[in-house]
């Protein structure tokens, strides 16, 4: 039974990770680039923002 729960947990984790990364398709945000916030916004059609190292595109 633990194997089944482990398999379901791994499948869920991978699904979330794939959905998160394929949704944005924008480069990661780095603090060394002063224009990163603008680049993220441009990549997301004017609505993106940097959250930690990740560029987030709200609204799909």
UniProtKB/Swiss-Prot annotation:
UniProt free text on domains: The presence of a 'disulfide through disulfide knot' structurally defines this protein as a knottin.
Keywords, comma-separated and alphabetical: Chloride channel impairing toxin, Disulfide bond, Ion channel impairing toxin, Knottin, Neurotoxin, Potassium channel impairing toxin, Secreted, Signal, Toxin, Voltage-gated chloride channel impairing toxin, Voltage-gated potassium channel impairing toxin
Upper lineage: Eukaryota, Metazoa, Ecdysozoa, Arthropoda, Chelicerata
Molecular function GO labels: chloride channel regulator activity; potassium channel regulator activity; toxin activity
Annotated localization: Secreted
Gene Ontology cellular component terms for the protein in this record: extracellular region
Secreted as UniProt keyword: yes
Record-given protein name: Neurotoxin BtITx3
UniProt keyword Secreted, yes or no: yes
Database matches in InterPro entries: Scorpion_toxin-like_sf, Scorpion_toxinS_Cl_inh
Tissue-specificity statement: Expressed by the venom gland.
Pfam family of the protein (one): Toxin_5
Signal sequence region: 1-24
Propeptide, chain numbering: 60
Disulphide bridges, residue numbers: 26-43, 29-50, 40-55, 44-57
Organism: Hottentotta tamulus
Recorded family membership: Belongs to the short scorpion toxin superfamily. Chloride channel inhibitor family.
Role of this protein: Toxin with unknown function in healthy organisms. On glioma cells, interacts with chloride channels (probably ClC-3/CLCN3) and MMP2 at the surface of glioma cells. This complex is then internalized via caveolae, thus inhibiting the chloride channels necessary for cell shrinkage and tumor propagation. Has been shown to weakly inhibit Kv1.1/KCNA1, Kv1.2/KCNA2 and Kv1.3/KCNA3 voltage-gated potassium channels. In vivo, induces contraction, severe paralysis and death in insect larva of Helicoverpa armigera.
